[in-house]
């Protein structure tokens, strides 16, 4: 069973020579905009293997010489896969860490001595406790020391690093503001280990680990930029779409203290290691025509023309030969003969993505429509990772499908329970207890006792405590109720609303369980029952919590099994991927775009607002200050504005989709 098919989704196939050049000369040509040595790999696993190869070589060389190998290690999602690869080599007895000395790059401050949120705990969980590093060779800053001892502790940390001969390597991730370790914007290139105030943007980013900003400690004790730059080698890692913008600035931008990671440009052996998604905005990947000759696919031509339109502020049909020549696109003139021919081709391609009939228009010529006319009506399954992703990402399209008489089913893949605040549970429990008092004269002892139990739990709840199973169940019920109300508003019968409660989600923690065959079996059973003609799945694979990717993997794995089994229904089924909660599709990838009127956009907003627990006080709103309905409207309006700027029809908003073809 293939459980990672989402990782094989390639929307823009980047020629190998642009990320894995064969010679130094080729690398110099395509990377001339880059100011740090950057290695790009097709997958996270390949990138991690590269880093692990370098680390293994260094450790073994030090062992051969009878020396320590000294590492400064960061924590987080970017570096964890590297640690997994190193652990794998240890477990296969390919590598020992007995001569390794580790310095934790930063620690939160202040912390209680018994605090469970220490960064060293994360480092131990993901790496140190899984290999043979001696306990006496692990050093960390102490987040529980008295404030007056901080300066001496930081000075001692610097001295201890020097005692071991300095750092051989630093393995770091990067924050959204370009921070490395806990060095916030404004940090000096000469800065040493010190206490630093955690900035507001970093606090928002840390919500992924702490549930709310309020739980994030106010400060960190961190190795300084100057300390990290003393390492013989520095690896900076980043994976996924969400890191692509900051990595472009760090790699191709100027050195500035507002992006501390740019100081790595001064290091003689700093190496940035990215997957293709994280490298998406580098010039050689996003605009390859600016650094080399290209193999011009339809998507690359569309991307180039949209870029040109935005750069010189012209619609497609007004682009001239001169515009092409002056902006590095003369190859297209040779390919198409003239700007006019290229303009018409791309204009028509974009025009054909627009449809007001997402389920196909019955009894109409569908030659140039994104969705086929028959069969009509269609059976449709919309898979929603959380109980609100459906309306956030494609609420307008769902209403259009219902109004056009298609048989629409909503499948909510997870309970979404940990994304409900404790106050919501308290509010509902007050109501239930009051209902018991008013209409049952408090005779229902189960309700009365459960009310007291939950009230007591919340009163005594401490930092790091996990909710009880009963509380998680109540939180799940709250989200189910909201989803049902939204479906009723959108005229979807409740017997077409399916709560799948995939097992991987039910860890009760931010970090989920691995997705397994049990999850796939639940999805597959629904598909076998409905036998859909259309499937909609989340394409928001940049979701910072990872739930969207796992949910999509479960659906794609189920489809894969049905394909292997020769399921008849799949032969007449199209699969569409949506975005909207965390990102939007790039215009060169859009294959169907559904326009929304002002009234339809307002109805979409109303659908989202039915999910009251996900408004202002909800945990995990991510790094975006806007509420989900605001994000959705802004993205949908931006897509419509982009089409308008290119000279196509002007709409209030648009929802975009990309077709997935089973691998």
Regions found by a protein language model. Give the residues of each.
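Histidine-anchored nucleotide/phosphate-binding helix
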Residues: 82-93, 390-415, 419
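Glycine-rich N-terminal segment of FAD-binding domains in flavoprotein oxidoreductases
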Residues: 61-94
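Metal-dependent de-N-acetylase/amidase catalytic core
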Residues: 203-211, 215-220, 312-381, 400-404, ...
């Amino acid at each position: 069973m293939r459980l990672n098919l989402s990782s094989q989704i390639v929307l823009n196939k980047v020629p190998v020579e642009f990320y894995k050049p064969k010679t130094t000369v080729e690398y110099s040509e395509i990377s001339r905009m880059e100011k740090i040595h950057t290695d790009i790999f097709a997958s996270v696993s390949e990138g991690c293997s590269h880093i692990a190869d370098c680390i293994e070589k260094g450790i073994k060389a030090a062992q051969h010489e009878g020396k320590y190998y000294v590492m400064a290690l960061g924590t987080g999602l970017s570096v964890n896969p590297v640690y997994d690869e190193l652990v794998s080599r240890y477990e296969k007895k390919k590598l020992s860490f007995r001569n390794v000395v580790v310095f934790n790059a930063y620690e939160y401050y202040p912390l209680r001595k018994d605090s469970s949120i220490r960064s060293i705990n994360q480092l131990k969980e993901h790496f140190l406790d899984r290999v043979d590093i001696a306990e006496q060779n692990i050093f960390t800053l102490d987040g529980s020391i008295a404030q007056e001892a901080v300066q001496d502790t930081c000075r001692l940390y610097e001295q201890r690093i020097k005692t071991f001969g300095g750092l051989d390597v630093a393995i770091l991730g990067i924050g959204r503001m370009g921070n490395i370790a806990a060095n916030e914007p404004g940090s000096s290139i000469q800065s040493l280990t010190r206490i630093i105030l955690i900035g507001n943007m970093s606090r928002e980013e840390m919500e992924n680990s702490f549930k709310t900003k309020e739980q994030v400690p106010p400060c960190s004790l961190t190795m300084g930029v100057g300390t990290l730059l003393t390492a013989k080698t520095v690896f900076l890692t980043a994976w996924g779409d969400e890191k692509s913008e900051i990595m472009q600035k760090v790699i191709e931008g100027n050195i500035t203290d507002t992006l501390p990671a740019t100081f790595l440009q001064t290091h003689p052996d700093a190496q940035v290691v990215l997957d293709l998604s994280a490298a998406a905005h580098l010039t050689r990947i996003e605009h390859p025509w600016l650094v080399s000759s290209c193999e011009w696919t339809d998507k690359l031509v569309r991307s180039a023309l949209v870029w040109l339109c935005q750069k010189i502020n012209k619609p497609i049909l007004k682009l001239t030969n001169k515009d092409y020549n002056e902006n590095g696109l003369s190859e297209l003139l040779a390919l198409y003969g003239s700007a006019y021919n290229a303009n018409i081709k791309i204009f028509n391609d974009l025009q054909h993505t627009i449809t007001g009939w997402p389920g196909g228009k019955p009894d109409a010529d569908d030659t140039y429509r994104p969705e086929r006319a028959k069969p009509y009506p269609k059976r449709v399954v919309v898979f929603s990772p959380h109980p609100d992703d459906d309306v956030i990402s494609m609420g307008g399209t769902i209403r259009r499908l219902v109004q056009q008489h298609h048989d629409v089913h909503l499948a909510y893949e997870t309970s979404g329970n940990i994304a409900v605040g404790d106050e919501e549970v308290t509010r509902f429990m007050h109501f239930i207890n009051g209902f018991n008092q008013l209409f049952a004269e408090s005779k229902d002892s189960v309700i009365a006792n459960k009310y007291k139990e939950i009230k007591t739990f919340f009163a005594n709840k401490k930092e790091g405590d996990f909710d009880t199973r009963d509380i998680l169940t109540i939180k799940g019920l709250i989200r189910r109720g909201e989803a049902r109300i939204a479906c009723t508003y959108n005229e979807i019968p409740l017997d077409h609303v399916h709560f799948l409660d995939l097992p991987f989600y039910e860890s009760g923690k931010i970090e989920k369980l691995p997705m397994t065959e049990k999850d796939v079996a639940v999805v597959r059973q629904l598909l076998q029952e409905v036998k859909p003609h259309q499937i909609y799945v989340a394409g928001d694979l940049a979701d910072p919590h990872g739930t969207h990717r796992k949910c999509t993997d479960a659906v794609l794995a189920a489809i894969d099994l049905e394909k292997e089994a020769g399921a008849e229904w799949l032969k007449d089924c199209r699969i569409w991927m949506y975005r909207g909660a965390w990102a939007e599709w790039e215009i060169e990838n859009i294959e169907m775009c559904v326009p929304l009127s002002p009234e339809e956009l307002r109805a979409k907003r109303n659908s989202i607002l039915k999910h009251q627990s996900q408004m202002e006080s909800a945990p995990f709103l991510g790094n975006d200050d806007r509420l989900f309905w605001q994000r959705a409207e802004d993205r949908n309006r931006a897509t419509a504005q982009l089409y308008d700027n290119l000279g196509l029809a002007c709409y209030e908003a648009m929802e975009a989709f990309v077709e997935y073809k089973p691998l």
